[in-house]
Amino acid sequence: QTAVGKKGLFRFSAMISLDRPIMGGDGYPLLFQSGETWKGKPLVDRQHPHDLFAELSVGYSHAINKDLDVFGYFGYPGEPALGGTAFMHRPSSLYNPDAPLGHHWQDATHITFGVATVGVRYKNFKIEGSSFTGREPDEDRYNFDKMRFDSWAVRLSYNPTKDLSLQ
């Protein structure tokens, strides 16, 4: 993050994955994992490789006062305001790069080619809304899929402490 003036914060994020060149198109063995395909066939007991570019995003937050912020975010690819943060975007996953078993079912939007989010934080509450491309990336892990902005989501969060977030 970089300060912009006295009340602004600008952020650029990039995340790359070397899954595809290292592991091949059908990924790596992971018992009980399912939910993806390779060359039209379901991957069973395997984790698919992620796209080379898992996130390229920019965000800006502006403090109106100590209790109120407004913010915007654009990702191509990025992550919309839908559910909890996907495993690969959490700081806690830094030393555990394997996908959890529920990854395909709970983190379906973690690499979304086209995300625009705006939101407001008031004290411990935050509401944000996203328009995004509502589909998984295609099987070509090196390209940028077409942005469609055909899905929408709203997320309300409450943070009673700095270590706890409820949605």
Regions found by a protein language model. Give the residues of each.
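Transmembrane beta-strands of outer-membrane beta-barrel pores
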Residues: 16-22, 62, 74-80, 122-124, ...
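Repeated loop/turn-to-beta-strand initiation elements of outer-membrane beta-barrel proteins
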Residues: 6-12, 66-70, 80, 120-128, ...
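Flexible, solvent-exposed coil segments and beta strand-coil junctions
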Residues: 33-42, 94-99, 130-137
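Residue-level signature of outer-membrane beta-barrel architecture
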Residues: 2-4, 60-62, 119-122, 157-160
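Loop-centered beta-sheet repeat module
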Residues: 125-167
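Hydrophobic alpha-helical hairpins/lids featuring a short glycine-rich hinge
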Residues: 49, 53-86
